[in-house]
């Protein structure tokens, strides 16, 4: 790959610190314990397996219930990993997303490719209130291009999501979780949390479910719809199966005929390419022509070009 010139640091986000609980009074501990004791006698906790252990930063127990029982921690591990990240990275840490280019600039035209180089920021176009809105972020990137003298791109916009090593999901995850919005995984350049929303609706029993992409658009992905409409009362059993190895996704399962039209969220394994696609569209709307289709880079440093 040819040398890439840095343009600017384009997007940053601060990891804010957690406020730690200091020593609680005995009365507060008793109140917390009483609350837990009451709740554990109610459903759904009463018939389930539950363990609670809450302690202060000094190690004093605030509340406890079945604290010695061995349970699968599930998403509680996010508290530990987040706390370790904040402690290790520090309060001044910022994620950075950089712009760069290959080739040369002549008379306002970049004769080469523009790169969006991800730094692991999970918030790009996520819609979170704490983050920069997508249009504001793209406007900032566009200003960086203009400062660099770029008014046209005779080449590709390429999303580079290679900041992290390895696959974007853990190989121990359940197969039917990989296509869900909570099984999307993360890479160095995410977009919209690497989630894609669909509008789905039933038709007739045993007929194919209607399914259309709403956001973000990924016209380079081949979508296969094998989902069917099921009897009333059978619920929503739609699953999408996909991989970052190929731009193919298949919708399977069923949707009850009494469910009506609804929104579904599935994983998007091409976050970097989606980011490049959306930014290229944004540039075109501003009159900054991009002559070639967007692309991304696979884990083996090969540029993958779209045909859409």
Regions found by a protein language model. Give the residues of each.
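Short, conserved beta-strand segments within well-ordered enzyme catalytic domains
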Residues: 51-53, 64, 72, 115-117, ...
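Short active-site loop at a secondary-structure junction
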Residues: 64-84, 88
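Short glycine-rich, polar/acidic loop-and-turn segments at beta strand-coil junctions
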Residues: 56-58, 75, 86, 120
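Beta-lactamase-like hydrolase cores
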Residues: 24-58, 63-69, 96, 143-149
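Bacterial Sec-dependent N-terminal signal peptides
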Residues: 1-29
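Conserved serine DD-peptidase/penicillin-binding transpeptidase domain
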Residues: 34, 38-39, 88-308
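Hydrophobic (often cysteine-bearing) scaffold residues that line and stabilize catalytic clefts
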Residues: 28, 32, 73, 77, ...
């Amino acid at each position: 790959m040819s040398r890439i010139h840095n343009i600017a640091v384009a997007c940053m986000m601060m990891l804010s610190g957690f406020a730690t609980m200091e020593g609680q009074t005995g009365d507060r501990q008793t109140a917390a314990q009483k609350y837990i004791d009451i709740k554990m006698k109610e459903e759904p906790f009463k018939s389930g397996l539950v363990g609670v252990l809450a302690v202060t930063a000094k190690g004093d127990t605030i509340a406890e219930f079945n604290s010695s029982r061995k349970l699968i921690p599930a998403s509680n591990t996010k508290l530990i990993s987040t706390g370790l990240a904040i402690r290790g990275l520090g309060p001044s840490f910022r994620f950075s997303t950089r712009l760069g280019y290959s080739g040369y600039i002549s008379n306002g035209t970049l004769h080469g490719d523009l790169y969006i180089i991800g730094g692991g920021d999970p918030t790009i176009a996520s819609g979170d209130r704490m983050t920069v809105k997508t249009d504001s972020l793209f406007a900032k990137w566009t200003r960086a291009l203009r400062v660099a003298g770029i008014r046209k791109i005779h080449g590709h916009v390429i999303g580079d999501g290679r900041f992290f090593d390895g696959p974007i999901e853990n190989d121990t995850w359940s197969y039917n979780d990989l296509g869900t919005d909570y099984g999307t995984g993360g890479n160095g350049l995410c977009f919209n949390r690497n989630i894609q929303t669909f509008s789905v609706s039933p038709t007739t029993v045993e007929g194919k479910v209607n399914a259309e992409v709403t956001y973000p658009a990924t016209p380079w992905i081949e979508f296969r719809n094998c989902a069917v409409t099921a009897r009333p009362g059978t619920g929503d059993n739609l699953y999408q199966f996909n991989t970052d190895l190929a731009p193919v996704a298949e919708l399977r399962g069923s949707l009850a005929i009494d469910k009506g039209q609804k929104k579904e969220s599935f994983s998007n394994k091409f976050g970097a390419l989606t980011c490049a696609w959306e930014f290229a569209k944004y540039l075109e709307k501003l009159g900054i022509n991009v002559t070639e289709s967007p692309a991304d880079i696979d884990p083996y440093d090969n540029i993958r070009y779209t045909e859409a």
